[in-house]
């Protein structure tokens, strides 16, 4: 893999409880909304679980993902192709954190910042079930 080793951690406040955040990260029908303009391989499961694998595309950039760890408040992906490394999500009531370490020719922190901004906006529109 060509590129530079990069590591970035961002934690932001969000207007949502942990359960809503979890659903927005684990359910492809939700994360495909806020991760636009990325597209995804066909055949995604309804909910990601350990060993789920899929491909994301952003223009010509292709990244393979595999869920390697999943707890009630965290998820970790192994990444390869466009980024060789990992992406870890952690969340709780009112906050979400994204940590990425990997080798890429593109600036990982820029994409991470934009994605967290989109997630914040998406979560602000979600309603807490009664």
For the regions a protein language model found, what residue spans apply to each?
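Short, intrinsically disordered, mixed-charge
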Residues: 23-37, 72, 117, 121-128
């Amino acid at each position: 893999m060509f590129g530079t080793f990069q590591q970035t951690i961002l934690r932001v406040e969000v207007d949502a409880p942990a359960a809503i955040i979890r659903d927005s990260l684990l359910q492809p029908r939700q994360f495909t909304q806020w991760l636009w303009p990325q597209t995804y391989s066909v055949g995604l499961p309804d909910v990601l679980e350990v060993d789920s694998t899929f491909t994301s595309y952003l223009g010509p950039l292709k990244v393979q993902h595999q869920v390697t760890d999943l707890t009630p408040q965290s998820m970790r992906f192994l990444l390869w192709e466009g980024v060789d490394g990992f992406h870890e999500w952690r969340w709780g009531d009112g906050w979400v954190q994204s940590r990425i370490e990997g080798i890429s020719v593109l600036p990982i922190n820029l994409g991470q910042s934009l994605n967290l901004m989109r997630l914040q906006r998406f979560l602000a529109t979600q309603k807490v079930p009664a």
